[in-house]
Structures are given as structure tokens and as C-alpha cells.
Swiss-Prot record:
Coiled-coil ranges from the UniProt annotation: 269-342, 450-525
Resulting phenotype, residue 18 to A: Rescues embryonic lethality and chromosome segregation defects in single knockdown mutant
Subunit structure: Component of the NDC80 complex, which is composed of at least ndc-80 and him-10. The NDC80 complex interacts with knl-1. Interacts with the RZZ complex components rod-1 (via N-terminus) and zwl-1.
The species this protein was found in: Caenorhabditis elegans
Disrupted gene: phenotype observed: RNAi-mediated knockdown results in embryonic lethality. RNAi-mediated knockdown results in defective cell division characterized by irregular chromosome segregation, premature spindle pole separation and defective formation of kinetochore-microtubule attachments. In addition there is reduced localization of the spindly-like protein spdl-1 to kinetochores.
Cysteine disulfide partners in this protein: none
Similarity comment text for this entry: Belongs to the NDC80/HEC1 family.
Pfam family, one: Ndc80_HEC
Gene name tied to this protein: ndc-80
Location in the cell: Nucleus; Chromosome, Centromere, Kinetochore; Cytoplasm, Cytoskeleton
Name this protein carries in UniProt: Kinetochore protein ndc-80
GO-annotated cellular components: cytoplasm; kinetochore; microtubule; Ndc80 complex; nucleus
Recorded consequence of changing residue 144 to A: Embryonic lethal and inhibits NDC80 complex binding to microtubules
């Protein structure tokens, strides 16, 4: 694109900077060899405007950023509504985006008019992708990374809106040029003076547009002196420029250089032997280079063969990897299916954890009570104390059995009975403390491990489900994007078809007009009517002959088709008889 290469300010033969307009130059300054790329900073609204004609203007442009943002936003919205209709984002969303995704969607809709299949890379940074595209298109100002952070900020987003507005202008210019390409390429060749005049006019228009973008408010004001100053500078530049004098100097410098080269050739007349030696040496170097090239070609062929073998092995490994991956996916699907069939819900797992914690508290209370009772002397003081201890033991045993039945825990131990004397009471307490309590703790710990396993399994299942949902949502978004892109492509194709139809209709109207003109000419000349009548008679005779031949051909084809139908019927009868014979043979064999 224009502006990709760095302009070096190339000099002419006499050292003067060229003012020729080339694709690698911008209309910046015609008085020197300075380049646009020397300073990459965009001129601020508070800095003096750069003049095309080497006259400094110290007036300060007004900081009317709101009107600029409003104009650019309306321009972008109208463009998207014109080409995208209902798919276009709202003007409020263009002016104040909610994030980078809104800006990316707007940029894709606009840039796809230049590149139909363009889609923003998923893992690419917006600062690098968008800035690189605008730089390649020749946008005259750099887009800093701070303009994107945060998106929609007052310090950077006006620059991005201005860039999108410039991109819309490029699209409209590109479409206009593509529609009038024939006149641009094959128009009349202009004379040198006319071409120079048009070149200067184009330079003046470019500089005027640049000043207009820097200070739109002053340019749009009818009472402003902007246009008078611009015309005065243009008139002054025409008066100061003298192209004929420059052409004379250029021709003189070219003649001087040619004379210098002729003198060098005359000076080298006596060095034929050295030149021949140099030529032979160069031929020897060429021969060596050819030998080296042949060696490299042999090496290249050998490497290509090895590369083909490596690629075949790689394809085999890839196919094996795909098979293994498919087996792994099948196993994962089976595991997921088993989890869905034999698993528990999250609510049941939480309820089991609560019950487990309550059981732990009850067991701890029982353990503390047993420890306290084991420290007592177990000396019977009277009959009332024994009854009290017996009732406590029976109540504790009943509570333990209720808890175990509620937890659905089976104890394969000797049941606890009511003690009859002090010795039985002591033995039962020791049995409860040493046998029942450890067994209950062991089973509760096992139940805890089972619950933790179920919980981890359900957490893995939830993570897998979230990943699957995310993949499906991404797939849905991609499908929506593809559908929208296909719809835009179809709409563009319909527009192109409409344009083609319009051109065909215009051509048809032209042909009708030409036909009318020819008919008028035919009426004026009677000989043409006679020729037309003769030609019509010949055409009618030819048509009758054609009809007769066609009827003869139809009759011949119909006869051939009848014969083919008869032969097909005979073949079908033979086929049926053959099937009957085969059925008889099968029955005989069976």
C-alpha cells in the first residue's frame, strides 16, 4: 500500500529534492527533502498546523473533540446501516463501547469490505492487530497502545473513531476507483504542462483535506478566512515555482555526468589486457558457482527424499495418535456415563456430610462419658447407686443403637445386655469402651472416606460439564459468526448481481436504440428491404427443411427405441427364467 516504504527524499542529479508524486511519497513539504516518517507523532490539536507551502501558521486549533467524535460516530453508524442494515450496532454502542469486543465487531464489519474473509484472530492482541492493519493501509498517524486501554476512554477513543472514519473513506474511494477503472487506466494522455497542473491541484487538495481534518470547525465556517489563506498560499507557490529553470539545470547536470563517464571510458582504453584477465577470472568464478549450485541441487534432492519419508512417518504417527485419542475419548465417555448412572446428587452429598459431622460429635460425647466412667472406682456403696449406674448404661446403649440404626450401620458384635450385678456392669462398660467405640469410629471414618470420594467425583463431573458448556457456547458463537459472514457475502453477491443486471439492462436499451436507428435506415433504403425479404424467404425454406429432417430423425429414433424396448423385454424374460432355474437348483440341492 501507499506509504509502506520509508521515503528517503531522493535527490536529482543537481542535488535538488524531487517533487514528483510517487506511491511512496506523501504531500508534506515541497521545499525540502523531509519525510513524513521522520516523526511518527500525530500533531496535537494544541500545536501549530503544518503548512504545505513553507509558511508557518501559529494559530491554535480549537479543541472541539466532542463535535469530532459525534461526526465520526454518525458517519460510522450511517455506513454500517447502509451496508449491514439490521446487523449494524447502535450509534450509542459505537460512541461508548462496553469493551474491546464491541470495537472488534465494529472493525470487522468495516474491514470486511476490503477483505471479505477477514476474521479477527482469537489469541491476537487488539493493539498489535489493528495498528498493524492501519499501518499497512497507509494511515498517516500512529495508533498508540494507550488508545485501547481502557476502551472508550476520552483520551484515546476519539483517535480510534477517527481511524475508523478514515477507513470508511478509503473503502468508498476504493469502490469509486474500481467502478471507473477503465477511464482511469485508458483515458487520454495529458501533456506535460497539464499533468503538472493536475499534480499540483491534487497536492493542494490533499494538504487542504489534511488541514480540514485537523480543524474541521474552522473549515466548515463560511465566514472563516481558511479558504482565502489557502488560495493565497497556492497562488504564491505558483509564482515562486519555475519548472523550466529546474529542467534546464537537470539537463545540464545530466550532460556533465555523461561527459564525466565518457572521460572515464577514454581513460580505460589502454587496459584491455587487465580487463580480459578480469573477464577470465569472472568466468572461472561463474564456473565454480555453477558447480557449487549443482552440488546444492543434489543435496536438495536428497533432503527432499528424506523429507518425504519423514512426512510419511509423521502421517502414520498422526493416524496412530488419532486412533489412540479416539480410544481415550471412548473410555472417558464410558466413565462419564457410569458416573451419571451410579453417582449421587450434590444435595445428598452435603446432607451426608452434615449427618457425618453430627455423628462425630455424638461419638466424642460418648467417648468422654466412657472415659469419665472408667475413672470411677466402681465400688458399690448402696443399692440405689447401682440402679442409677445401670439405668445410665441402659440409656446409653439405647442411644447408641438408635444412632447406628439411623446411620444404617450394621455392627457384627455381641449385643449389649442389661447388667445384673456390679461385675457385669464393669465388664459391659469395658466392652463398650474397648470394642464398640473403636468399631463405631472405624465405620464412621470409612463412611467419611466414601463421602469424600463421592464429593470429588461430583466436583470432577461439574468441571467436565462446565468445560462442555463452554465448548458448546464457543461453537455456537463461531456458528453465529460464520452465519453472519455468509449472510454478508450473500448480500454483497446480490448487490453485485443487481449491478450486473443494471448494466445488462442499459446495454439492452442501447441495443434497442441501435435497432431503431437501423430500422430507420432500412426504411430509407428500399434495396435493404428486398434483401431482407429474400433472406426471410430463404430462412423460411431452411426452416421447413429443418422441420422435415427433424420429423425423419424422430421417426428413426422412435423405431430404434421400439426395438430396444423389445430387446429389453426379452432380456427380462430370460432373466426371470434364469432365476426360476436357480431356485429349482437350490431346492434340489437342499
Amino acid at each position: 500500500m501507499f506509504g509502506d516504504r520509508r521515503k528517503t527524499g531522493g535527490l536529482n542529479l543537481n542535488g535538488r529534492a524531487s517533487i514528483a508524486i510517487t506511491p511512496t511519497k506523501r504531500f508534506t513539504d515541497y521545499t525540502g527533502s523531509t519525510s513524513v516518517r521522520k516523526t511518527d507523532a500525530r500533531p496535537s490539536l494544541s500545536q501549530p498546523r503544518v503548512s504545505l507551502f513553507n509558511t508557518k501558521n501559529s494559530s491554535v486549533a480549537p479543541r472541539d473533540v466532542k463535535s469530532l467524535v459525534s461526526l465520526n460516530g454518525s458517519k460510522i453508524y450511517n455506513f454500517l446501516v447502509e451496508y449491514e442494515s439490521s446487523d449494524a450496532p447502535s450509534e450509542q454502542l459505537i460512541m461508548k463501547p462496553r469493551g474491546k469486543n464491541d470495537f472488534i465487531a465494529c472493525f470487522e464489519l468495516i474491514y470486511q469490505h476490503l477483505s471479505k474473509d477477514y476474521e479477527f484472530p482469537r489469541h491476537e492482541r487488539i493493539e498489535e492487530e489493528v495498528s498493524q492493519i492501519f499501518k499497512g493501509l497507509g494511515y498517516p498517524y500512529p495508533l498508540k497502545n494507550s488508545y485501547y486501554q481502557p476502551m472508550g476512554s476520552s483520551h484515546g477513543y476519539p483517535h480510534l473513531l477517527d481511524a475508523l472514519s478514515w477507513l470508511i473513506d478509503i473503502i468508498r474511494i476504493n469502490s469509486a476507483v474500481s467502478e471507473d477503472t477503465q477511464n482511469i487506466l485508458f483515458g487520454d494522455f495529458m501533456e506535460q504542462g497539464k499533468a503538472q497542473e493536475k499534480t499540483l491541484n491534487y497536492a493542494w487538495m490533499t494538504s487542504t483535506f489534511r488541514d480540514y481534518t485537523n480543524d474541521r470547525k474552522a473549515a466548515e465556517n463560511p465566514s472563516s478566512s481558511y479558504w482565502d489563506d489557502t488560495k493565497h498560499r497556492l497562488r504564491k507557490y505558483f509564482e515562486q515555482s519555475n519548472e523550466f529553470e529546474d529542467m534546464t539545470k537537470t539537463a545540464a547536470s545530466a550532460l556533465e555526468m555523461l561527459n564525466y563517464e565518457c572521460d572515464e571510458i577514454e581513460a580505460d582504453k589502454g587496459n584491455e589486457a587487465s580487463l580480459k584477465e578480469e573477464i577470465s577470472r569472472i568466468r572461472d568464478d561463474i564456473r565454480k558457482a555453477k558447480d557449487y549450485l549443482e552440488q546444492n541441487l543434489h543435496v536438495k534432492q536428497h533432503m527432499e527424499k528424506e523429507l518425504a519419508m519423514v512426512k510419511s512417518e509423521q502421517e502414520e504417527k498422526i493416524s496412530e495418535n488419532e486412533k489412540v485419542q479416539k480410544m481415550v475419548d471412548d473410555l472417558k465417555n464410558k466413565i462419564e456415563l457410569q458416573k451419571q448412572i451410579h453417582g449421587l446428587t450434590g444435595k445428598e452429598v452435603r446432607q451426608m456430610n452434615l449427618d457425618n459431622n453430627k455423628d462425630k460429635e455424638v461419638v466424642l460425647e460418648i467417648q468422654s462419658e466412657l472415659d469419665r466412667l472408667s475413672k470411677e472406682t466402681w465400688k458399690l456403696k448402696d443399692e440405689d447407686f447401682f440402679k442409677e449406674q445401670k439405668s445410665k448404661f441402659i440409656h446409653l446403649a439405647e442411644q447408641i443403637m438408635k444412632i447406628l440404626s439411623g446411620l444404617n450401620i450394621q455392627m457384627n458384635l455381641e449385643p449389649l445386655r442389661a447388667p445384673t450385678n456390679e461385675r457385669d456392669l464393669k465388664d459391659y462398660w469395658e466392652t463398650l469402651n474397648k470394642i464398640w467405640v473403636p468399631e463405631i469410629s472405624r465405620q464412621l471414618h470409612q463412611r467419611k472416606l466414601e463421602l469424600e470420594t463421592e464429593q470429588s467425583r461430583f466436583s470432577n463431573k461439574a468441571v467436565t460439564a462446565e468445560e462442555r458448556i463452554q465448548i458448546q457456547s464457543e461453537t455456537l458463537c463461531e456458528a453465529k459468526k460464520n452465519e453472519a459472514r455468509e449472510e454478508r457475502i450473500r448480500r454483497n453477491e446480490r448487490d453485485s448481481w443487481k449491478d450486473a443486471r443494471k448494466h445488462i439492462e442499459q446495454r439492452y436499451e442501447q441495443l434497442l436504440n441501435e435497432k431503431e436507428v437501423l430500422l430507420k435506415q432500412m426504411k430509407l433504403d428500399g434495396s435493404l428491404e428486398k434483401e431482407i425479404e429474400d433472406e426471410t424467404a430463404r430462412m423460411s425454406a431452411t426452416g421447413e427443411e429443418h422441420i422435415q429432417k427433424r420429423s425423419q430423425l424422430e421417426a428413426g429414433i422412435r423405431q430404434i427405441l421400439d426395438l430396444m424396448v423389445v430387446e429389453i423385454a426379452e432380456i427380462e424374460n430370460k432373466k426371470i427364467g434364469f432365476h426360476v432355474q436357480c431356485a429349482g437348483i437350490e431346492k434340489a440341492v437342499l
